[in-house]
Amino acid sequence: MEHFDILIIGGGAAGIAAAKACAGAKVLLAERKGKLGGVLLQCTHRGFGINQSGIQYAAQLTKEFPGSITLALNTTVLSVSKEKTALLSGQALGRREVSFSQLILATGCREIPMGALPIAGIRPRGIYTAGQMQEQMNLYGRIPEGPAVILGAGDLGLIMAGQLARAGLEVTVVEKQQRCGAIPRNRRCLEEFPIRLICGDTLSCVHGEGTLQGCTTKKGTYLPCKTLLIAAGLRPERELAAHLGQPDWLHICGNCNTVHSMVEAVVNEGEQAGYAALENLGGTL
């Protein structure tokens, strides 16, 4: 079994920053996708760093990435044990077990799906999380069918509202709070496009067999739509380490620690995790 000083799980902003901070140790970075960058790679909108898109910011982060780090792309970490071993599965590695001295968890967060919400009805075609549609549009050039309804007026919900409106779709945003919670930059789409915003309400039911036809709000408003995006929030994705407790060799950083609104905070946490892991190694290098 090959041993690594530090195992980093996740190749988004936090994982990249952690890897760069602990270069010099024997490091393995496992990323389930085929490229470093995480969710940044599907963000064409600006607002990262100095008015950069997420794609540009990811390119900047990965510039001068340490060649000494073992990079395992298209690799999933299936399990981690309290004995400091991890089971990996990937295209290049196959199914392989490794051991480590320090673990950095940088697995990010995941969207709350429709199945976790109290919305009645079957699940016809046309329902996506906002992030899924962002990926489809920005990476694969797919334009969904309108009209569109978006549940949630946070940052991601309004980013997608603006993007759909720009693509020519009629868009309605439903927000359960009395006002939208997005930052001012992302709220601008409500002024630039004829986007309907319904606050103080939520969805109670979806309609359609085979294909989505519409949805009804809790207050009884029927909204015809062919596309429904769920932007109901994000949850840290740290189930992989839930059974480990809080050992001093585990460092949780970025959005799997707590969901951040600014990528700079994610990068900072990743760097700090890398430095802490390196310090814990002490004289073992």
PLM regions and their residue ranges:
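Residues forming the flavin
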Residues: 1-285
